[in-house]
């Protein structure tokens, strides 16, 4: 079995890290009062209550 290419390994690692950082940034922005569109929208309260019931928050 041949060793894996370092370039391929770096691509996979940085892709996963990029998604993690993107999700972290989106959740931080979403938790701020100015950009929290889930609580400010008309159907947002219903969506939040459904998510809380689903995840037990």
Swiss-Prot record:
A bacteriochlorophyll binds at residue 26. It is found in: Cell membrane. The modification N-formylmethionine is found at residue 1. One of its GO terms (molecular function) is bacteriochlorophyll binding. The chain crosses the membrane at residues 11-30. Keywords: Antenna complex, Bacteriochlorophyll, Cell membrane, Chlorophyll, Chromophore, Formylation, Light-harvesting polypeptide, Magnesium, Membrane, Metal-binding, Transmembrane, Transmembrane helix. Gene3D superfamilies: Light-harvesting complex. One of its GO terms (biological process) is photosynthesis, light reaction. Residues 1-10 are cytoplasmic. It is a single-pass type II membrane protein. GO terms for cellular component: organelle inner membrane; plasma membrane; plasma membrane light-harvesting complex. Coiled coil: none annotated. Residues 31-57 are periplasmic. Pfam families: LHC. The keyword Cytoplasm does not apply. Belongs to the antenna complex alpha subunit family. Antenna complexes are light-harvesting systems, which transfer the excitation energy to the reaction centers. The core complex is formed by different alpha and beta chains, binding bacteriochlorophyll molecules, and arranged most probably in tetrameric structures disposed around the reaction center. The non-pigmented gamma chains may constitute additional components. This is Light-harvesting protein B-808/866 alpha chain. It comes from Chloroflexus aurantiacus (strain ATCC 29366 / DSM 635 / J-10-fl).
